[in-house]
């Protein structure tokens, strides 16, 4: 272990805690310079740069991190998230796919992939992704809502109804929004008693 690099990573964590991202990034960069094999430092820099909207620079550090630790699903997910924030759905799908190859139980990667597939008009694939996200997190209203929208885009009205009925069990407000957005006024009685 490189003790000097470790000290800079520790200082960087302190700066993160104190909400001083510029100083944290500088400390992580120093740590990475002292220990170029530190995927932890590369990941942290990429995450901080992404949170500040410096995507091009963040991408370089994400690629360094996945090169150093190619089997870390969370890093691939974060790379996909960054591409999604840049409105690059095809690149995001590639990164989410890699995250899911490593960890098929990563529900947020299924959800992110579904959103990107929807953005590309790949509704059939999006349905499968949202179904996986919903199976892994049965009470995630956003996964079920977007599943319903993808089913609606494919004109699968019976499936939309099933999704609305499932969503109604735990999130009436999101159910009302899905009923509205899919034009399923025949099911509006389910949420007739909701205020605002």
Q: What positions do the PLM features span?
A:
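Structural signature of tandem alpha-helical TPR/SEL1-like repeats
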Residues: 17-30, 51-64, 85-98, 120-132, ...
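Helix-start (N-cap) detector for alpha-helical repeat units in TPR-like alpha-solenoids
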Residues: 4-6, 39-40, 73-74, 107-108, ...
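Alpha-helical segment of the N-proximal tetratricopeptide repeat
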Residues: 3-40, 44-53
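Structural marker of alpha-solenoid helical repeat scaffolds
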Residues: 34, 68, 102, 136, ...
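Terminal, low-structured helical/coil segments at or just beyond the last alpha-helical repeat
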Residues: 1-5, 11, 159-196
């Amino acid at each position: 272990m490189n003790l000097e690099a470790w000290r800079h990573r520790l200082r960087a964590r302190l700066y993160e805690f104190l909400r001083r991202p510029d100083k944290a990034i500088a400390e992580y960069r120093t740590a990475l310079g002292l220990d170029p094999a530190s995927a932890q430092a590369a990941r942290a820099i990429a995450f901080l740069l992404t949170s500040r909207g410096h995507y091009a620079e963040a991408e370089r550090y994400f690629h360094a991190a996945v090169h150093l630790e190619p089997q870390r699903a969370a890093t691939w997910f974060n790379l996909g998230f960054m591409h999604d924030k840049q409105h690059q759905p095809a690149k995001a799908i590639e990164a989410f796919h890699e995250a899911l190859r490593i960890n098929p139980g990563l529900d947020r990667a299924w959800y992110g992939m579904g959103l990107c597939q929807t953005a590309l008009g790949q509704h059939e694939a999006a349905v499968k992704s949202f179904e996986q996200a919903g199976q892994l997190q049965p009470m995630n209203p956003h996964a079920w809502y977007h599943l319903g929208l993808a089913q609606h885009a494919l004109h699968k009205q019976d499936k939309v109804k099933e999704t609305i009925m499932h969503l109604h069990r735990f999130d009436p407000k999101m159910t009302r929004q899905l009923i509205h957005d899919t034009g399923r006024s025949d099911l509006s009685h389910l949420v007739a008693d909701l205020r605002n």
